[in-house]
Amino acid sequence: MARIRGYRRKTNYKGFFVVLFLVAIGALVYFASQSEIFEKKSPEIIIENAGNFWNPKTQTQIILKDSSAIKSYSILATLENGEKVLDIQEVVLDKPKELKLFLPVPQRKLPEGAKISYEISATDWSNSNFFSGNTTLKRLDFTIDTQAPKIEVIASSFSISYGGSALIIFKATEDNLKKLVVSNGVDEFVPFPYLKKDYYATLVAWPVKNKSFTPLIIAQDGANNQTRYQVAIVKKLKGYRDSTIRLQDKNFGKVDELAQMLVPDMKFESQSEKFRYINESIREKDEKAIFDASSHFEVNMITRPIIFERFYPLRGAQVVGSFGDSRHYYYKDKNISNSYHLGLDMASVANAPIIASNPGKIVLEQKLGIYGNTIVLYHGLGVSSLYSHISNFKKALGDDIREGEVIAESGSTGWAFGDHLHFGILVQGQFVRLAEWMDGKWIKNNITSVFQKGEKIILRNQK
């Protein structure tokens, strides 16, 4: 075939540039979508301590958060009838990634029980949504509540001893109660509903670890209105023994035995360090297990006064170690460890039967370190009894125990020198003075009679 001189085939550059343009646009859109300036995550609106009830006098904090910064926010408040009582719109030019402010209060006074709704919106500086940014809207509905709970003490123990216990019966009136506790100034105690609605009974302890005692009933409602009512109870400052114990080399045998049993792989630089670890760290671990077992219980309505019999778990026993003893251990004239003795040591014959003085339920049956084989028996109203250094368990975890039943036998497990029982009483996990709970007269005057007085007043008020 003959070739025609001067002919040249045309190239379609137009189509090529169209494809190239579309690819470029696609890449631009993709990279823009992945870019921080086009991020699509909406701002976060956090309202602190917001419930269904609100006291305008309390400050409610709002936190606005966004990774691309907050551009603007608005707050609109309307009443139940649709009336607008607040309308705020703000542009935030300094571009904070976190903005804190307080929920604004309408200028007009709102009546008790009024319904108010807030709509809070926040928009960020992102260029997404056609450069308008991402917006979050949050709605809050409140009932106005400015009245604090009312507290009235019905009956209480006249006095409390350092290390001892007291019973308080009171009335707390509030339809929207969020928190109700009784405090000794340090620890908090859960009240038990007693007889009728709004009435409560609580045993409170003054542990030896606390040098002061301030009995307070603290009630807080859903709008965070709070009442702190101080109960008038006479404080008796009973002293406890302060013991200095000088250790000799022969005293470390039991420590070596416990360390080998409890922490066989742990290395100690000295006998003093080993003694301190066993006496303080292992003791702390034991007492946490005891606290957990004796402070977790069902809070049920008490339908009649609780009658406690005096506790005396070991018949014919002698006391060989007192409660509240502050012990300071010295080795070669150096103080190496300190601890409190939070029970009563009682000795009788070897493997003596341990008797439950009051009915209860076994909530702990465990081999501990310092305390050895241990039972905790829960009796109700936050009261538990402790039995340690046991040789033989006679009952099992979860068993319901009747008054007078044998639950175990005394022994020398744990850190015990000779067969004896370490006996303790706890009020909601706090060790208390044994002499009170082993005294029938004290129980009658400080527990039983207070229950009965409270019952009489409550039933009279219901008529």
Spans of model-derived segments:
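Short beta-strand segments of immunoglobulin-like
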Residues: E48-F53, A155-S161
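Short, solvent-exposed loop/turn segments at the edges of extracellular beta-sandwich modules
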Residues: T123-F131, D221-N225
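Short edge beta-strand/loop segments characteristic of extracellular beta-sandwich folds
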Residues: Q59-D66, S156, G164-T173
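Catalytic cores of peptidoglycan-degrading enzymes
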Residues: F308-I457
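Aromatic sugar-binding surface patches on proteins
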Residues: L93-P106, K196-L203
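N-terminal Lys/Arg-rich, disordered targeting/topogenic segments
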Residues: M1-Y13
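Proline/serine/threonine-rich low-complexity linkers at boundaries of modular beta-sandwich domains
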Residues: G26-I46, S132-K150
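Non-catalytic extracellular/periplasmic "stalk"
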Residues: S165-L167, K178-S322
